[in-house]
């Protein structure tokens, strides 16, 4: 290995971006196969390869940061910029869904009956499960902040407790969302209302699952004493992501569930 005279981490060649891209291709193709041909084989293969990629990529990053000390303050600064840019790209991603929703709802076409919700659609009551889900995510935002403050103060017990509560609330949100989908009186194929509703809330639900997984990894790392008050970017990134998921849900609730109903 050549002598390094800078603070940057020169990453070794890794197969995980390639396997991650392959798993994304398998999952999206598998989702199409499931929708149109009721076959979950390709989707299951995609989920399996995605899970393996996540495990091995996280393992490598934990090794590089915690055990090899490659994540210097300069590297962490770069990672912070990367996470900020990623969240900005996610904001633009959801902007597209809100644009589609408002484009359809503010000037409904004659095919929709000239009204919103379209003729024949019975929207969900925003004061039932959606309101409960809103309170759950707001509570999880409080608990993740509690976890962050506990970590900064070196309070290991409260950090683990708060992080566990956040993950439990995330799982509870996902279960409630799944039950809401199961009982919804309309489907994804019920015109523009069904498609915008399920795609927007479905992608948000996917982000909650990803965020819960991210936080679960952070909990395991905290149990193994990986985080300190000045070296915990993995948790910080997960907390930023979780707050982003919270804010997106508030916009979804106000726009699609409350105003859109």
Curated annotation (Swiss-Prot):
CDD domains xrefs: Cyt_c_Oxidase_III (cd01665)
InterPro entries reported for this sequence: Cyt_c/ubiquinol_Oxase_su3 (IPR024791), Cyt_c_oxase_su3_dom (IPR033945), Cyt_c_oxidase-like_su3 (IPR000298), Cyt_c_oxidase_su3-like_sf (IPR035973), Cyt_c_oxidase_su3_a-hlx (IPR013833)
Mitochondrial intermembrane side: 35-40, 106-128, 184-190, 257-261
Cell inner membrane recorded as keyword: no
SUPFAM superfamilies to which the protein is assigned, alphabetical: Cytochrome c oxidase subunit III-like
Any single GO CC term annotated in Swiss-Prot or TrEMBL for this entry: respiratory chain complex IV
Function: Component of the cytochrome c oxidase, the last enzyme in the mitochondrial electron transport chain which drives oxidative phosphorylation. The respiratory chain contains 3 multisubunit complexes succinate dehydrogenase (complex II, CII), ubiquinol-cytochrome c oxidoreductase (cytochrome b-c1 complex, complex III, CIII) and cytochrome c oxidase (complex IV, CIV), that cooperate to transfer electrons derived from NADH and succinate to molecular oxygen, creating an electrochemical gradient over the inner membrane that drives transmembrane transport and the ATP synthase.
UniProt-listed PANTHER family: CYTOCHROME C OXIDASE SUBUNIT 3, CYTOCHROME C OXIDASE SUBUNIT III
Protein name, as recorded: Cytochrome c oxidase subunit 3
């Amino acid at each position: 290995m050549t002598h390094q005279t800078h603070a940057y981490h020169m990453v070794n060649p890794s197969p995980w971006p390639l396997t991650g891209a392959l798993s994304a291709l398998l999952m999206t193709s598998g989702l199409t196969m499931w929708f149109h041909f009721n076959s979950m084989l390709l989707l299951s293969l995609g989920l399996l390869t995605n899970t393996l990629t996540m495990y091995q990529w996280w393992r490598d990053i934990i090794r590089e940061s915690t055990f090899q000390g490659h994540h210097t303050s300069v590297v962490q600064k770069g990672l912070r910029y990367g996470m900020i840019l990623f969240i900005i790209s996610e904001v633009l991603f959801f902007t597209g869904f809100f644009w589609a929703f408002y484009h359809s709802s503010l000037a409904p076409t004659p095919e929709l009956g000239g009204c919103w919700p379209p003729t024949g659609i019975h929207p969900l009551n925003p004061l039932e499960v959606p309101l409960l889900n809103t309170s759950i995510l707001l509570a999880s935002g409080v608990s993740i902040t509690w976890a962050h403050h506990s970590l900064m103060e070196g309070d290991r017990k409260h950090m683990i407790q708060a992080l566990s509560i956040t993950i439990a609330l995330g799982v509870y949100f996902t279960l409630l969302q799944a039950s809401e989908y199961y009982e919804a009186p309309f489907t994804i194929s019920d015109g523009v209302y069904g498609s915008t509703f399920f795609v927007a809330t479905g992608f948000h639900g996917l982000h909650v699952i990803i965020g819960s997984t991210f936080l679960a990894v952070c909990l395991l790392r905290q149990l193994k004493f990986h985080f300190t008050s000045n070296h915990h970017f993995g948790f910080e990134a997960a907390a930023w992501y979780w707050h982003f998921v919270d804010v997106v849900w508030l916009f979804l609730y106000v726009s699609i569930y409350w105003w859109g109903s």
